[in-house]
Structure formats: structure tokens, C-alpha cells
Amino acid sequence: MIWKRHLTLDELNATSQNTLVAHLGIVYTRLGDDVLEAEMPVDARTHQPFGLLHGGASAALAETLGSMAGYLMTRDGQCVVGTELNATHHRAVSQGKVRGVCLPLHLGRQNQSWEITLFDEQGRRCCTCRLGTVVMG
């Protein structure tokens, strides 16, 4: 297991109360040895005006996963902030849920890079993101 902080899924989800994460309906669903996953509904909260998943909502899910994964790699007195987010949208999604899968690309003492892939309910890749974070403190 790569994580330096050991939180349960319930504890991870509790951090989202009264935030954008909760408003968008994002829920952490899996914390594996080197992976963090979450789901987000595709509904009125996350649609753009034409009834498709908004690219900004996809980016919010990606940044949520990468930032929390980065936080799990810190020690007491440290936090992480995102410095760069890149998102490539591959497929439109109009309903259901998307699942985000976050894996580390680089875990340095001060800089981290995370790959976050979003899948629709049929398991098709709909968005690929990369998040860079900086460890502070």
C-alpha cells in the first residue's frame, strides 16, 4: 500500500460534507493499494445545457480524486494543492454515473502527478485527465 494516511471510505466521504464534492454527488467507492475511485451521477447537477455531462464536472471529479489521493500521500502538517489539470474528453455521457479511477504517475517529495480516467456505466473510457499537485508544509 502506498498511502501514508490511513482513512476509511466513510472518513473520506465525510470530508466532502458541505462542499462542491457533495453538491455534485461525488462519492468515494474504492481505496486500493495504489488506486482511489469515486462515482459521480450524470444528472441535472452535472449536465451542460444540451443534456450531456459537463466537461467542468468531469474536471471536478478528476481534481477531487487526484487531490484526495495526493493528500493521502502526505504526513501530518502537510497538504497538497493542484497546480495543473489536463482533461481530454473522448465520449459523451448523458445519464447514469461515471466512475473515476485515480492512479499515481509520479510521487516525489514535493511534486506528484496523477492519472484519472473516467468511465461510463458500460466501462467505456469517456475522459482522461492528468493532475499535477504540490506538497505544502
Curated annotation (Swiss-Prot):
CDD domains: PaaI_thioesterase (cd03443). The keyword Hydrolase applies. Pfam families: 4HBT (PF03061). Its EC number is 3.1.2.-. Pathway: Siderophore biosynthesis; enterobactin biosynthesis. It is found in: Cytoplasm. One of its GO terms (cellular component) is cytosol. It is an enzyme of class 3 (hydrolase). GO terms for biological process: enterobactin biosynthetic process. It comes from the Bacteria. Keywords: Cytoplasm, Hydrolase. InterPro entries: HotDog_dom_sf (IPR029069), PAAI_dom (IPR003736), Thioesterase_EntH (IPR026576), Thioestr_dom (IPR006683). Transmembrane segments: none annotated. The active site is at residue 63. Homotetramer. Dimer of dimers. Interacts specifically with the aryl carrier protein (ArCP) domain of EntB. Belongs to the thioesterase PaaI family. Required for optimal enterobactin synthesis. Acts as a proofreading enzyme that prevents EntB misacylation by hydrolyzing the thioester bound existing between EntB and wrongly charged molecules. This is Proofreading thioesterase EntH. The gene is entH.
